[in-house]
């Protein structure tokens, strides 16, 4: 709190000074925001514009779902049980390059996924798929759009996209509105 009893939103008190850069972003389309960005982001992740500020906290909220998949192999393909149906798993070949003492090595493997998300491990005889932020374009839209929100009503409308999957959000505007959005 300032000496005049105004709230402050601190950016990144938990990270080192060099973890995130802080900058101002201005455009002819109405963007004028200052704050912290992470490498490669084209939006202010947490910061403020002329009338509003936002920041994020992390917590142990339930923001990921895991599914135990019953997997069956038939005719060289994997299927998973969904209700009373067997649905085909999506399979994708991925090649990873790595440096070795004699040069570059390639390792190719198959990644599987269901409608719930990618398979990440095996638990007993079940395969485990995870569902977390499966809307990357919507997440980018939400992250960029909130930099232009001038008040709580506009910010809340943007947050209705529900694609900021791993953080809680704190918000304050020049009208005196203060909000906490839990794992949005």
Range-by-range predicted roles:
Residues 1-184:
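Mature extracytoplasmic enzyme cores
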